Amino acid sequence: MLKIIIPTTMLLPMTWMSKHNMIWINATVHSLLISLISLSLLNQLGENSLNFSLTFFSDSLSAPLLVLTTWLLPLMLMASQSHLSKETTTRKKLYITMLILLQLFLIMTFTATELILFYILFEATLVPTLIIITRWGNQTERLNAGLYFLFYTLAGSLPLLVALVYIQNTTGSLNFLIIHYWSHPLSNSWSNIFMWLACIMAFMVKMPLYGLHLWLPKAHVEAPIAGSMVLAAVLLKLGGYGMMRITTILNPLTNYMAYPFLMLSMWGMIMTSSICLRQTDLKSLIAYSSVSHMALVIVAIMIQTPWSFMGATALMIAHGLTSSMLFCLANTNYERVHSRTMILARGLQTLLPLMATWWLMASLTNLALPPSINLIGELFIITASFSWSNITIILMGMNMMITALYSLYMLITTQRGKYTHHINNIKASFTRENALMALHILPLLLLTLNPKMILGPLY
């Protein structure tokens, strides 16, 4: 694990020592090299004693998420260049420092062995994200968004700390690898139910569960491009990862407690998809679509079968790349039209034909077109939920239909029709932007050839 953590740490002095015209090149190239090194972790053997240590370990669940995290840093740096072009050199370096720190915390969170260490790093990711949103966001509402983000996440994760201390006192260990061998099934007593809720709530807020999701659209809409990308692609996956790790420890209570959350997630999935159909703000639409996709992941994790876990992992990776790409595309529109309202930025296909191609590909992967990994993840989840209860197929089918509807609504509103008069003289798309979109879509296309790399715990 140190072969990734140490080079990432060394990005910090490198950024501050770079000359002002070399900052972006240095940071992007070196972070890309780190992400290429991390690809070796995807080749997980069955008995991988190589990747275990007392502090950090990686298995087939954390490796795909870890690679996604490292892959995203160069993409965030590429996307942010235009947004920061008017800032001073020191501020650019500070911004890059925040992104690198965030990546460092995320890598360590995904690979921590001790639950308390996991909790500390889980909370540490909050600080750089908050600074990125409240310092570099576009509108003044960013302060309000930062406040929502901070208090939802903090209030959700405080009970987790108490529950972890309680588990430590009863079992004597908080190590992920050891605690599984503590074969003491939890009874349905009130104290255990409260402990279960305390453990799960932090991750439910982070996912977010429908009803606890109000911070997400605000934070997404007000964050700068890199903030939106990392929030959608990796920070939401922390919730899913934490739930997968902790629900297996709390069995068989999870099976008993899962029903209300399953119903709420399925209902929320339909609701947030329907909200997407009425959005005028492009970033807000993509944010709500994230909530509906993550509701599917919550359903999968709560069902607790091997198939559903595989589906959850696949959908998390697929959604990370897809939503990040959609935010990049929304940002390219915003930089040209200076508005997030979809009606003001319509008919762009005639002006930016190559961007329209990227829009089409992103929308199609978002609505889970075969053979994309989004579809593979959704099929696993739908199969698992159907075998859990036949009635769920109605809700799942409705969700897939509404997802297709809002994806096409987004595509048609932004790309088709006659363009408005105030966007006659917009700039053509840059090579940087096209490379950025290609680096998002290529992993998605390549993973369709070998999806078992990201199917998580079973492979």
UniProtKB/Swiss-Prot annotation:
Segments forming a coiled coil: none
Transmembrane segment boundaries: 22-42, 60-80, 98-118, 147-167, 193-213, 224-244, 257-277, 284-303, 308-330, 351-371, 391-413, 435-455
GO CC terms: mitochondrial inner membrane; respiratory chain complex I
InterPro entries named in the record: NADH4_N, NADH_Q_OxRdtase_chainM/4, NADH_UbQ_OxRdtase, ND/Mrp_TM
EC number from the UniProt entry: 7.1.1.2
UniProt-listed Pfam families: Oxidored_q5_N (PF01059), Proton_antipo_M (PF00361)
Bilayer topology: Multi-pass membrane protein
Source species, domain of life: Eukaryota
Reactions catalysed: a ubiquinone + NADH + 5 H(+)(in) = a ubiquinol + NAD(+) + 4 H(+)(out)
Localisation: Mitochondrion inner membrane
Keywords annotated in UniProt: Electron transport, Membrane, Mitochondrion, Mitochondrion inner membrane, NAD, Respiratory chain, Translocase, Transmembrane, Transmembrane helix, Transport, Ubiquinone
Any one GO BP annotation for this protein: aerobic respiration
MF-aspect GO terms: NADH dehydrogenase (ubiquinone) activity; ubiquinone binding
Protein family (similarity comment): Belongs to the complex I subunit 4 family.
Record's function text: Core subunit of the mitochondrial membrane respiratory chain NADH dehydrogenase (Complex I) which catalyzes electron transfer from NADH through the respiratory chain, using ubiquinone as an electron acceptor. Essential for the catalytic activity and assembly of complex I.
Subunit description: Core subunit of respiratory chain NADH dehydrogenase (Complex I) which is composed of 45 different subunits.
Stated name of the protein: NADH-ubiquinone oxidoreductase chain 4
Gene it is expressed from: MT-ND4
